[in-house]
Amino acid sequence: MTAQLNPFRNAFRLPTKQRINWFPGHMNKGMRQIQQKLRNVDCIVEIHDSRIPLAGRNSQFFDTITGSGVKPHILVLNKVDLLGPKQQRSVLQQLRRQQPELKNILFTNCKDQRNHGVLDILPLATQLVGDSSRYNRAQSAEHNIMIIGVPNVGKSSIINVLRNVHLKKRSAARVGAEAGVTRAVGERIKIQEKPAVYMIDTPGILQPSVTDDEMGMKLALVGCLPDHIVGEDLIADYLLYWLNKHRRYEYVEKLSLSSGPSDNISAVLAEYAQTHGMFHRVKQYDGQVEVMTNLLAAARKFIQFFRTGQLGSINLDEHA
């Protein structure tokens, strides 16, 4: 009996040998500024995207910032509204199994000011600071909390939510839909009066080189890298690969694919574009204008479906 061939790829490879690399000048500057301010920091709050609990979290960077565990540390997994309760439990077990040194983990949705995880950040940080040896800051009544993490995971948004909740004041940290809005380590932002708590916003820091294709594509898919750095067509192709690999075929109905699951991103995008009237006019070399399916618009829509949770709750580090 002939074994049935797997119609899908069993590995994802970039079309060129060039690795994804996004470590612009403001990140180098940010790293130096972070290290300069550490002496006056009492607690580190690391914000990360809950859909990639492992990918992009630099252990060497973590050790440098926390002093190998000397400074209190909280891992905040944000955007939990895109994960779901069942996936939360799975992620928690995964982290405790692979990184047992992580003691303080919170799941948050920074879009909801009543979210329990968001409301727990400040009390937990205050408790950890109170229980820690503050050394040169032992006489200070103020608490300084530094917010760190990769780009576009909601660091500035969480600062603004906490400021609004505890001080009833408007936003103080810049936010944006794309990675890289915060480009320098900010000044202290007051979050609470008694005790006086200040937060320090920082630019998103990635490893100087993303040496693993899968890690780079996961970061790109959740928006930690600007889409144009990687290319929407490549991001959409990785999304298709991941969904097929994990037998998550919800995309077939969402994209109105009459032929069922496919491993051909060009065919998938072309069918979706045709079905939904996505066309654009392209001028040919001979000057003639041809109406063609807009594959880029279709790729952006496919990515948007994932980022807004319309393809279901997904942990991209599942089985990692």
From Swiss-Prot:
Subcellular location: Mitochondrion inner membrane
UniProt membrane topology term: Peripheral membrane protein
CP-type G domain residues: 31-208
Residues that coordinate or bind GTP: N78, K79, V80, D81, N152, V153, G154, K155, S156, S157, G204
Descriptive protein name: Mitochondrial GTPase 1
GTP-binding as UniProt keyword: yes
Keywords from the UniProt entry: GTP-binding, Membrane, Mitochondrion, Mitochondrion inner membrane, Nucleotide-binding, Transit peptide
Gene3D superfamilies from the UniProt entry: 1.10.1580.10, P-loop containing nucleotide triphosphate hydrolases
GO MF terms, alphabetically ordered: GTP binding; GTPase activity
GO cellular component: mitochondrial inner membrane
Main location: mitochondrion
